[in-house]
């Protein structure tokens, strides 16, 4: 990757398995770019998951090529696909300012 000018990548929905693959490349001396993972959360994310994220973050703390120090929280969708919750209806398409299933990603009291 570095030989093509790609020096860093980031996955906003990284997984432990994916991080382990990059770690294997690092151990074999074949990782030629920086990799940053952000773990996604959901309504079923629990304390054990958060503890796992913390252990993994600490494992790679100070590593110059591998990072896993971010967690992605979803509120709704994105404007481009008309899944973001809006105050007013979309002017060009979509459903009346709601996500695809008509709800926020999580129940409002959890935000």
Protein language model regions, located:
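Glycine- and other small-residue-rich loops at beta-strand/loop junctions that grip anionic moieties
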Residues: 11
């Amino acid at each position: 990757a570095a030989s093509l000018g790609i020096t860093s990548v980031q996955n906003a929905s990284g997984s432990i398995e994916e991080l382990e693959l990059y770690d294997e490349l690092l151990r074999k001396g074949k990782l030629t770019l920086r990799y940053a993972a952000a773990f996604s959360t959901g309504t079923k994310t629990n304390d054990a998951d958060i503890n796992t994220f913390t252990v993994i973050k600490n494992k790679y703390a100070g590593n110059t090529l591998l990072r896993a120090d971010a967690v992605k929280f979803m509120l709704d969708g994105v404007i481009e696909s008309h899944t973001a919750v809006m105050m007013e209806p979309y002017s060009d398409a979509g459903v009346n300012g709601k996500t695809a299933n008509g709800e926020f990603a999580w129940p409002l009291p959890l935000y």
